[in-house]
Amino acid sequence: MSKPLKQIHLAAHFPGVNNTTVWSDPRAGSHVEFSSFAQFARTAERAKFDFLFLAEGLRLREQGGKIYDLDVVGRPDTFTVLAALAAVTEHLGLTGTINSTFNEPYEVARQFASLDHLSGGRSAWNVVTSWDAFTGENFRRGGFLPQEERYSRAKEFLATANELFDSWHGDEILADQETGTFLRDAKAGAFVHTGQHFDIHGQFNVPRSPQGRPVVFQAGDSEEGREFAASEADAIFSRHATLETGQAFYTDVKNRLAKYGRRHDQLLILPAATFTLADTDAEAEELAKVVRRQQVSGATAIKHLEFVWNRDLSSYDPDGPLPDIDPDVGDNHISKGRAQVRMYRDPLATAREWRELAAANNWSIRELVIETGNRQNFIGSADTIARTINELVQADASDGFILVPHITPGGLDEFADKVVPLLQERGVFRTEYEGPTLRHQLGLAHPDDVPGEQRVAS
């Protein structure tokens, strides 16, 4: 007997501070004005997507001592945008990336509980940590933590926030107009938490929200990040969008759940994925090449090499050969605030590999960056992309995808109009929303209904 088809989850990532965005395209809109966010969210909701996802950047990146201005620079506050979007959408989940290294549990819990009320139960929290002192300077001098301590703090941060969410049970508000009694229990919201990172006590001032707690996402790919996701998260935002790497990641993380008393269906794996859509596969391949050349200008290619070489390469011609000099293997002093710096842990080996590739293919600096960088995950006609997405989900390489269009706010429209109907015809994607909350859309139980989720505050 064949197993039933898995239902696909789809989300929309409003792109910003990353090299997937072609902000200079004439069709691109603002990354700050609310109209762009609203249009993007309405398209996602029209297509019956599960949620909208906002990333976060806590400091403007620098390169060579100057603001890195080849990508989008600056963005509005995440909570402000999500609260505004709650007013112009009805079903779409609202996921915000909020840092656990530089915030406090009470403040963040208050913001998410408020967003959950305002949206009718559609809030989600992507819990992240920060690894660099450069970003920390915006918050406190010398402000960063070693990796182990970052995840220790993140775990306690989330546990503390959950205590605050659970300090209200949901039945405390009586609001009896005849007797003038508003609260059934004067101890509502009382909490006491004493731990390694937080020592707080008081009363939480936001009543229990529709979801009880926001849906929790985690985006780390390290060993610590995978364990954190397996023990705490409802969904994990990953970068593994191919069959082989996706299945390996999916199996690894799902197999960690048992040690925490959790089932496989209690954690969703949702890789980020870019796409290029055209009428035919051949046209899509050509369009993908155009998009990559838009994303990698000559100046961008030189800056990309500087991440690895850790040197000022501004005098080099992007249409010329790679530098003969070796990378500076000391502390990176060229690029600051860029996670990509950590992707090349052995710059000498990376430079050697790139020189060999460039020599074998007669590539210039720009051609090398175009060919070795991130190409679109899904390239093809609507039918090809729908088939590919479905095959990956049914093969347990993912539970769905967080789609990242290269143009905002209109870059999602064609996917919504052409790919989504094909997935619906295959019976693997909803035609209507399942219920009022994001937990309903994702098939996740309410915290009150999950065994072992006892409340620890009273």
Q: Which residues does each PLM region occupy?
A:
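Hydrophobic faces of well-ordered beta-strands that scaffold small-molecule active sites
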Residues: 8-12, 52-54, 92-96, 123-127, ...
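N-terminal beta1-alpha1-beta2 module of alpha/beta enzyme domains
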Residues: 2-88, 211-214, 328, 436, ...
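Hydrophobic, small-residue-rich alpha-helical packing segments that form membrane-like cores
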Residues: 3, 9-19, 23-35, 77, ...
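A structural motif
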Residues: 49, 120, 233, 397-398
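Alpha-helix-loop-beta-strand connector modules within alpha/beta enzyme cores
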Residues: 67-94, 259-260, 415-431
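An alpha-helical appendage that flanks or caps ligand/catalytic pockets
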Residues: 2-16, 148-211, 244-248, 255-393, ...
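Conserved, mostly hydrophobic/aromatic
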Residues: 10, 44, 48, 85, ...
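Short, acidic/polar
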Residues: 31-44, 218-229, 381-394
